[in-house]
Amino acid sequence: DAGFMYAAKMSGQSESYDFFTPDAGELAFLADELAPHPFYTRGFILHPNDNVPDLIRRAYQHQNAARYLLVKGESDYIVHKSQVVQKVDQPSFEAMEAIGGTGDTLTGLLSVLCGADFELTDAAVLSAGANRWSGHYADPSPATQVIELIEKIPQALVKVLNEHNGKNDNER
């Protein structure tokens, strides 16, 4: 979680971890080699969505990133050792930004898929996709509660796993 990423950065242990799942604001803290706490992050945070690749580069440059990053946002960036290997941006729902807990569902999906021995890049891509598809199936509004998305995770996982395995939605 975010608090643990902060502790890993400040202890110099970031590179010891397989994954961090920051949003753009949390990534700005990882990218700022001088900030001892997110409150002190320099101006990077003011334009977080249009400079994500630069923030990724800076976080790795200063050894403040895990081996993999799954940067959450309008587009989800899957990164391995400073290289963006994939972006997941569909389906997209503005309303999901207002739903508390979607980062937790993403982290949970990622943990499950890593625990199921998926290759780490695949686990990140699939979890980002499943999290987004759970939103699609829940048809979110700003009033949607995260439990409504959680209830759609099995359906979303079937979809992304079928696509990953080369099956269409009608095959089981």
Describe the residue ranges of each PLM region.
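Fold-independent oxyanion-binding glycine-rich loops
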Residues: 1-3, 22-25, 30, 72-74, ...
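Conserved beta-alpha-beta core of the PfkB/ribokinase-like small-molecule kinase fold
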Residues: 1-51
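Glycine-rich phosphate/pyrophosphate-binding loop at beta-loop-alpha junctions
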Residues: 24-26, 84-89, 96-98, 127-143
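Short, small-residue alpha-helix embedded
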Residues: 29, 99-130
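Gly/Ser/Thr-rich active-site loops/lids in small-molecule metabolic enzymes
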Residues: 45-50, 88-111
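Conserved phosphate-donor
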Residues: 52-97
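Short, well-structured alpha-helical segments that form the helix of a local strand-helix-strand
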Residues: 52-61, 119-135, 146-154
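Charged C-terminal helix
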Residues: 132-172
